[in-house]
């Protein structure tokens, strides 16, 4: 594990990665305004074979590469948003997963730090796209909750 305090903006850095996970934490504005980071999500991650997670407080914040990043994400981890509940609703409406999200969120958000995981990967069948308790953190429930 390595911590890098700033966003690496060198193509050589991204091309040298393989079989690893990169987490871009709280650098959405900088990442979403970088053509290189847009290419990281669009090209490098698939060709060089590494995974990228990016965190954002506001999913729909506009920037030159924000839609490129959103369109190339396979997984979305949604937490209960007290300040703006419309954000999660807008996300699931765009993904056509409103029914599943309603069920999953009522289960997940009844627990501390509850979340809903949405997977858009073609490797996962659509009925298993929405789940909670993925990491079995609920000691009374050691199985993943899927919502169809």
What do these predicted ranges mean?
Residues 68, 75-77, 81, 86-148:
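P-loop NTPase motor core of the ASCE superfamily
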Residues 2-103:
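Conserved P-loop NTPase motor cores
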């Amino acid at each position: 594990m390595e911590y890098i305090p700033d966003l690496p903006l060198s193509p050589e850095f991204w091309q040298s990665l393989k079989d690893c996970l990169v987490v871009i934490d709280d650098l959405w504005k900088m990442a979403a305004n970088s053509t290189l980071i847009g290419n990281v999500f669009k090209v490098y991650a698939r060709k060089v074979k590494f995974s990228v997670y990016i965190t954002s407080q506001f999913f729909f914040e506009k920037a030159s590469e924000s839609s490129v990043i959103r369109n190339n994400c396979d997984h979305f981890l949604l937490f209960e948003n007290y300040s703006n509940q419309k954000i999660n609703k807008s996300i699931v409406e765009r993904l056509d997963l409103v029914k599943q999200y309603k069920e999953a969120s009522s289960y997940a958000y009844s627990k501390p730090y509850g979340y809903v995981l949405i997977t858009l990967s073609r490797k996962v069948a659509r009925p298993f796209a929405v789940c909670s308790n993925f990491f079995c953190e609920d000691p009374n429930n050691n199985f993943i909750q899927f919502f169809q």
